[in-house]
């Protein structure tokens, strides 16, 4: 099965450029320019990875990361012009897996996407999902509805 990548970037040229840079990797793409569109597709599809702009016309990407983390551990890579240390730390602490500042190299983006998917695959081997619970055996923890519980 092809990996399903969600690109949420309001700059149409960059949105299309990201898809073109990653197209040879046999991913299936959902491309949107607003958070509302992204929310809808996340409800309908099992997205493998999210590439998310921080500054969007209908909201803040970092707030959206927090929203996603309430229900999902999908890898999220933030893409933004916000390059101050406090911005990077805030994004990562909100739950993003990676933070890339614009402008960025599309080759570096491809590599970082690959790393996140590889990490997700490795984590899946050490986890199990059952009836809305996610069990992570290597960390001895589980999630219910995105909230962590320790055993």
Residue ranges and their predicted role:
Residues 2, 73, 124-125, 130:
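A structure-centric signal for secondary-structure junctions around beta-strands
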Residues 26, 128, 146:
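Conserved short-loop catalytic and cofactor-binding motifs
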Residues 1-118:
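N-terminal/domain-start alpha-helical segments
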Residues 150-151:
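Conserved small/polar residues in nucleotide/adenosyl-binding loops
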Residues 115-127:
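The C-terminal output helix
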Residues 130, 137, 144-145:
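Structural motif
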């Amino acid at each position: 099965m092809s990996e399903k990548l969600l690109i949420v970037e309001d700059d149409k040229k960059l949105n299309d450029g990201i898809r073109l840079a990653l197209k040879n990797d046999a991913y299936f793409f959902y491309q949107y320019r607003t958070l509302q569109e992204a929310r809808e597709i996340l409800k309908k599809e099992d997205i493998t990875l999210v590439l998310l702009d921080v500054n969007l016309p209908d909201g803040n990407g970092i707030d959206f990361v927090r929203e996603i983390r309430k229900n999902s551990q999908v890898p999220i890579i933030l893409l933004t012009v916000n390059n101050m240390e406090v911005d990077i730390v805030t994004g990562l602490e909100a739950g993003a897996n990676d933070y890339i500042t614009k402008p960025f190299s599309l080759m570096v983006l491809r590599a970082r996407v690959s790393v996140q998917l590889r990490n997700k695959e490795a984590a899946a081997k050490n986890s199990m999902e059952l009836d809305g619970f996610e069990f992570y055996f290597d960390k001895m923890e589980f999630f219910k509805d995105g909230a962590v519980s320790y055993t």
